[in-house]
Every structure is written in structure tokens, then in C-alpha cells.
């Protein structure tokens, strides 16, 4: 296991300029050809992101619905493990936190063992859960990158293949009852062509997000995945519009009751949401380098 305790100094060139403050819906629809950038919904907060041939997974391996949230459909779970399209050639897994509707050790370990070139990025709590399930001497743990970050700590970063990764700790929503859960916000640039961000179950606290403004501004985010309640909360909306300032946002963590009712949920929330496993969204106007086409 690789452990990040003291983040290295940030060396990210400022590229944020001229972005409109609003949050724009991502356009989905039939394509004449495979889009250069696309997000595919697994279920709950699980998303596959593909940009110019580079693929990553957020919160994809979990086993608990808590009686409220959708599980990844069996067929998709099988396709993930087998590496069948669109789940082929994945480079990395990202885990926001240890709750069972975002992460379970057994399916994550099964995937890592099936795909020996894939790395997993998460908190120390995630790494500890994997080590407990696998045994501390299991070689698979060498591909687990653990970030030891407290809220208020400097962001950390990492590079893996064509991925440029940075991560910051934002507390889990729910106040004191969730204070023992480490929630990480990952921002990942793929092939230097597009950048996505996953908020996990971050609290919609404007002061906390404003205190990280230099971090949010350090790179332009093309698509952010907030928990859907950010759209239903005035503070959450202001965070997306004034702090994150991504080109587009698609809410996740939508209850299973929304399956088949997406239009109604989107209308009620006033923003775009992933509601049905298998849904896709095109990510912006991406130009791939010739070698990645």
C-alpha cells in the first residue's frame, strides 16, 4: 500500500479563466460516432468516465443499498469484472469513502485481482478495510494508494499513466454523526483532454468550499458529480455555481425510487441527474491528441 501522509507541494498550472458561473446540463443523445468523452452511470454514486480512450471508475464496487439506493445491476457487475465494453481498459478506481453504498472490500478486491494493472485511490479507511479483508501481506495492496487527509489539510496529488489526480478532504454530510467518516473529493484529468470531479457525500457547507477556492480554481473542471441534494439546497447550488464552477454537473446518489422517473426527478431538482443505470452523458467538446484517437 502506498500511503500519502504529507502532500507534496502543488505544481498545477492555473487554467481557470472565463468560465460562466452557472451550472449547465450535459447534453445526451444519439451520436454519429463514439464521443471523445462520456460518463456512464452504474448506480447510486458509481460512474464510469471515458476520455480519449482513458477510463476510470468512481464508487463502482459496493454491496449495500441501505434499503434506499440502487445496486449496480448484475449484468453490469459481470461486465465490469470481465472487462467487457464499455468497462474495458480501465486505468484506476476512485473511492470517496467507506460507506457500504459506495464501497465494499470484496468486489473491489475481486476487480483488482482480475486486473493487475489497475490502481485504487482512496482514504486510509478504505485501505484499512481492504487490508483487513485481504490480509496485510496481500500483494494487491501494493496498488492501493491511500491518502491520509483531514479536513483543512493541504490537497494531495498523484499521477498515474494518463491521469493527473488531486484530492481534498471535505467532511461527509450529516454533521457529528458522520464525523468519523473520511470523505474525499477527487478531481481527475484524463489524457490532458478533460477533467472530472466526484464529491462523494460532501457536506454542502459554503464556508468550507470557499476556503478551498484556490484549489477549485487551479484547474478547469468539465464535469462534476455532486450528490443530488446539492441541487435541492440553496447552499449546494451556490457551491456549484460560485465555488466549483464546473462547465457541467450531473447529480448522483439518487434513490432507487427515481429509476424510470428521471424526468420528474430532474424537474423537481432543477438540475441534471443520473437516475437509471446505463444512462450516459457526453462530456463537453473534447479534442483528443492524435495518438489517443
Segments the model singles out, each with a brief description of its role:
Residues 15-27:
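Bacterial N-terminal signal peptides
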Residues 33-83, 179-203:
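Conserved beta-strand hairpin/beta-sheet module of binuclear metal-dependent hydrolase folds
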Residues 54-98, 105-110, 203-218:
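Pre-active-site segment of Zn-dependent metallo-hydrolases
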Residues 82-151:
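Active-site HxH/HxHxD metal-binding segment of metal-dependent hydrolases
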Amino acid at each position: 500500500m502506498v500511503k500519502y501522509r504529507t502532500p507534496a507541494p502543488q505544481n498545477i498550472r492555473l487554467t481557470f479563466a472565463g468560465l460562466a458561473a452557472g451550472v449547465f446540463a450535459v447534453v445526451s443523445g444519439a451520436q454519429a460516432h463514439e464521443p471523445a468523452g462520456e460518463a456512464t452511470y452504474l448506480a447510486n454514486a458509481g460512474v464510469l468516465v471515458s476520455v480519449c480512450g482513458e477510463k476510470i471508475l468512481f464508487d463502482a464496487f459496493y454491496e449495500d443499498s441501505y434499503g434506499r439506493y440502487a445496486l449496480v445491476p448484475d449484468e453490469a457487475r459481470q461486465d465490469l469484472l470481465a472487462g467487457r465494453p464499455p468497462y474495458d481498459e480501465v486505468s484506476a478506481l476512485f473511492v470517496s469513502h467507506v460507506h457500504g453504498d459506495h464501497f465494499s472490500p470484496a468486489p473491489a478486491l475481486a476487480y483488482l485481482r482480475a486486473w493487475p494493472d489497475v490502481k485504487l485511490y482512496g482514504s486510509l479507511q478504505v485501505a484499512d478495510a481492504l487490508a483487513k479483508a485481504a490480509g496485510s501481506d496481500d500483494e494487491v495492496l501494493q496498488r492501493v494508494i491511500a491518502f491520509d487527509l483531514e479536513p483543512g489539510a493541504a490537497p494531495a496529488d498523484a499521477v498515474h499513466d494518463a491521469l493527473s489526480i488531486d484530492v481534498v478532504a471535505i467532511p461527509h454530510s450529516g454533521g457529528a454523526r458522520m464525523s468519523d467518516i473520511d470523505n474525499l473529493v477527487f478531481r481527475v484529468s484524463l489524457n490532458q483532454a478533460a477533467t472530472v470531479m466526484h464529491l462523494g457525500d460532501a457536506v454542502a457547507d459554503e464556508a468550507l468550499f470557499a476556503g478551498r477556492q484556490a484549489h477549485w480554481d487551479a484547474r478547469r473542471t468539465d464535469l462534476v458529480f455532486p450528490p443530488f441534494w446539492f441541487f435541492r439546497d440553496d447552499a449546494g447550488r451556490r457551491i456549484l455555481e460560485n465555488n466549483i464552477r464546473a462547465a457541467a454537473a450531473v447529480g448522483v446518489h439518487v434513490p432507487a425510487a427515481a429509476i424510470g422517473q428521471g424526468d420528474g426527478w430532474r424537474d423537481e431538482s432543477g438540475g441534471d441527474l443520473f437516475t437509471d443505470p446505463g444512462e450516459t452523458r457526453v462530456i463537453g467538446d473534447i479534442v483528443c491528441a492524435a495518438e489517443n484517437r
